[in-house]
């Protein structure tokens, strides 16, 4: 507990919050180039082959980013858009690739949750009477 005089002289220091996605440098998105596309297995209770890509961002940092959805078109040297967001069962994967941006197509045949997977809207023909 500080004394009154210590508070007058030094004040209270506010804690600085640590960023969960430091490579984005306070930006919502960063563009980058895909270096490697690979599959990894998740932590203990889960079992799958999760698709991730190693991406070199525009600020020269290299990160591992998760590729969401069922099928993907991510290849080496593709230009991708990266957003923050951890994958709970993949250690070291703190970023997601945005589908439907730059060289990456969205998930085809998606009817619900389309914006998350970059799926286009099926236009409904309206006839005038």
Curated annotation (Swiss-Prot):
Native organism taxonomy: Bacteria, Pseudomonadati, Pseudomonadota, Alphaproteobacteria, Rickettsiales
Role description: With S4 and S5 plays an important role in translational accuracy.
SUPFAM superfamilies (UniProt xref): Nucleic acid-binding proteins (SSF50249)
Any one of the GO CC terms: small ribosomal subunit
Family matches, as Pfam families: Ribosom_S12_S23
Swiss-Prot/TrEMBL keywords: Methylation, Ribonucleoprotein, Ribosomal protein, RNA-binding, rRNA-binding, tRNA-binding
rRNA-binding listed as a keyword: yes
Organism: Rickettsia akari (strain Hartford)
Name under which the protein is recorded: Small ribosomal subunit protein uS12
Domain of life: Bacteria
Keyword NADP carried by entry: no
Molecular functions per Gene Ontology: rRNA binding; structural constituent of ribosome; tRNA binding
Family stated for the protein in its record: Belongs to the universal ribosomal protein uS12 family.
Biological processes per GO annotation: translation
Location of 3-methylthioaspartic acid modifications: 89
Gene name of the record: rpsL
InterPro entries: NA-bd_OB-fold (IPR012340), Ribosomal_uS12 (IPR006032), Ribosomal_uS12_bac (IPR005679)
Quaternary structure and interacting proteins, as annotated: Part of the 30S ribosomal subunit. Contacts proteins S8 and S17. May interact with IF1 in the 30S initiation complex.
HAMAP family: Ribosomal_uS12_B
């Amino acid at each position: 507990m500080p004394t009154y005089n210590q508070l007058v002289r030094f004040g209270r220091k506010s804690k600085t919050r640590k960023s969960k996605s430091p490579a984005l440098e306070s930006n919502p998105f960063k563009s980058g180039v895909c270096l490697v596309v690979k599959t990894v297995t998740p932590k203990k209770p889960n079992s799958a082959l999760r698709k991730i890509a190693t991406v070199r961002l525009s600020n020269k940092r290299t990160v591992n980013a998760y590729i969401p959805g069922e099928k993907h078109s991510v290849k080496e040297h593709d230009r991708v858009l990266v957003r923050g967001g951890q994958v709970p069962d993949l250690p070291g994967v703190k970023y997601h690739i945005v589908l439907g941006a730059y060289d990456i197509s969205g998930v085809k045949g998606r009817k619900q949750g389309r914006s998350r997977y970059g799926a286009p809207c099926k236009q409904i023909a309206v006839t005038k009477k």
